[in-house]
């Protein structure tokens, strides 16, 4: 209970403060339930900025990037797990090593590439940069390793194509991994602050 309150406490205070006047927010002792519920703060947020536009842009990016990551990461994880090709494990390790590179180290080169390609101030810049994830491939690969190779071989003997095995057998058996990646990716894109600040300039595109 103590841990749960510690986690929920700040969120509850934030909701409570949203209904208070500025002078009431930091009063001591904390009044969790406001004396009077003021809706002015919500009215100001809704009308002082283009909140509906920002909200829809954020939702659009979060949904598109999440769907793309699920597709690209699951395909890559399937290849790294069930397909046999030269240098498979080495390529996976090299791809995984990209997680060790801080985003701040590639921020400027990334921006220069985006500008050179003419993608600056477009949602496509954010979508393309986040459509692939080494972390997502790692999660799904670990999940797919638990699927017996005999199941994959049996499907091949029955005449199922490689993509058919991926779509009809592998994906249904990795629902738990896909669910985890969905939540993590959506949450990460929804909370992304730096990306839109760097690559978007028009108010109608901001999140």
Locate the predicted segments by residue.
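A hydrophobic, multi-pass inner-membrane permease signature
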Residues: 1-207
């Amino acid at each position: 209970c103590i841990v749960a309150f510690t986690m929920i406490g700040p969120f509850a205070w934030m909701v409570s403060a949203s209904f208070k006047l500025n002078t009431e927010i930091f009063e001591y002792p904390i009044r969790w339930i406001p004396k009077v519920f003021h809706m002015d703060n919500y009215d100001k947020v809704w009308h002082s900025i283009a909140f509906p536009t920002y909200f829809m842009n954020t939702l659009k990016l979060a949904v598109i990037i999440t769907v793309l990551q699920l597709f690209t990461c699951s395909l890559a994880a399937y290849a790294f797990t069930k397909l046999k090709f030269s240098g498979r494990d080495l390529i996976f390790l090299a791809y995984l090593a990209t997680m060790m590179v801080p985003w701040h180290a590639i921020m400027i080169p990334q921006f220069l590439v985006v500008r050179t390609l003419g993608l600056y101030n477009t949602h496509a810049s954010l979508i393309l940069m986040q459509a692939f994830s080494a972390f997502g491939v790692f999660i799904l690969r670990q999940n797919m390793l638990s699927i017996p190779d005999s199941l994959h071989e049996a499907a091949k003997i029955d005449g199922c194509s490689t993509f058919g095995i991926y779509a009809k057998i592998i994906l249904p058996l990795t629902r738990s991994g896909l669910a985890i990646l969905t939540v993590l990716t959506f949450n990460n894109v929804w909370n992304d602050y730096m990306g839109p600040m760097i690559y978007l300039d028009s108010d109608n595109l901001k999140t």
